[in-house]
């Protein structure tokens, strides 16, 4: 998470990428359902019924039943996925709050007017923007190609390392 001010980037590492969401889903299903799924299945669950708020959606997925040891199919509900991801959603909000608290007052009004941007593939998770808005009261912008914005931002920083101020 970063904030550009006077050609300096204020940043805070948020180690919450798509893989962390997928791992949380895998672990929750294994613990609660005694059922093992792979990373691709977890990604499918996340992008199909993953949401910052509980919905009435569900998805049938294949994996291995840990009780029988056999391949099987199970229905995963939105509440299961939300339970797995809610702590990560809150961690994102907490990290945004920290960087906003460190933002110079000169640009706080710009942030208030323009909002914050969610980037990265996981920003596509349903209602994540609404969750951040509900928690912070700030406009939330979602990028058209969130995966690309992360790469472009890192590229800009690599080209000019003086932009970085890490705390």
PLM regions with names:
Residues 38, 156-167:
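Acidic, glycine/GT-rich loop-and beta-edge segments that sit at the periphery of enzyme/chaperone cores
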Residues 50, 54, 108-132:
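Glycine-rich phosphate-binding loops at beta-strand->alpha-helix junctions
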Residues 84-111, 157-160:
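Phosphate/ATP-binding catalytic cores across multiple sugar-kinase/actin-like superfamilies
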Residues 130-155:
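Conserved phosphate-binding/catalytic loops in two-lobed NTP-binding clefts
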